[in-house]
Regions:
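Carbohydrate-active catalytic/glycan-binding domains of CAZyme proteins
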Residues: 1-176
Length: 176
């Protein structure tokens, strides 16, 4: 196993695009992320498939790392909205994955996610995982919660998604 990452074409770079011709770069690409942690460089050196989640206080960029097997994970970069996003120093990389094979029992290799906002303003995480270590890739959808620090929480199980005391609702209706 190699321990020093080698760029094989699947690291995260950012550059400014020409607004009139968005297929043309008008700045040099800058490296935002490479697989520098053990959880990110299993079998291959990949940081790929970035997707932005923008809130009032932070810009989050999730990405997938490792091989597309049970080691596949979702990592996180964050930056302040007013920061120079082309400056790599503006981005903070978390040293742990937000989703992994340990996030939910029976779900392996969770990765390559995106976000959807529904008509009620709830944010949902769409991703793929495997029902078994060697199972086929399957789609998953889970509600995104935000911690007290404003960061997304992607690994809540169904049991933790809603407090048990809130699962049953009753009311009295008075008709006059």
């Amino acid at each position: 196993r190699q321990f020093k990452p080698v760029d094989q074409g699947a690291w995260l770079y950012m550059a400014e695009l020409n607004p009139e011709e968005p297929w043309k770069l008008i700045s040099d690409p800058v490296l935002l992320s490479m697989p520098e942690y053990g959880w990110a460089n299993n079998h291959t050196f990949v940081d790929e498939g970035p997707f932005a989640l923008i809130t009032e206080k932070k810009i989050f960029l999730t990405f997938s790392s490792a091989a597309v097997d049970s080691t596949y994970v979702v990592g996180l970069l964050s930056a302040d909205p007013e920061a120079d996003l082309l400056d790599p120093k503006s981005w903070i990389k978390e040293n742990y994955p937000l989703m992994s094979s340990r996030s939910k029992e029976g779900e392996y290799g969770t990765g390559h996610n995106s976000y959807i906002m529904d008509e009620d303003g709830l944010v949902w995480n769409a991703y793929h995982g495997k029902p078994g270590v060697d199972g086929p890739r399957s789609s998953g959808l889970r509600r995104v919660h935000f911690g007290a620090d404003g960061y997304p929480v992607l690994d809540l199980t169904e049991e933790k998604d809603l407090a048990p005391g809130l699962t049953e609702v009753s009311m009295d209706v008075v008709v006059k």
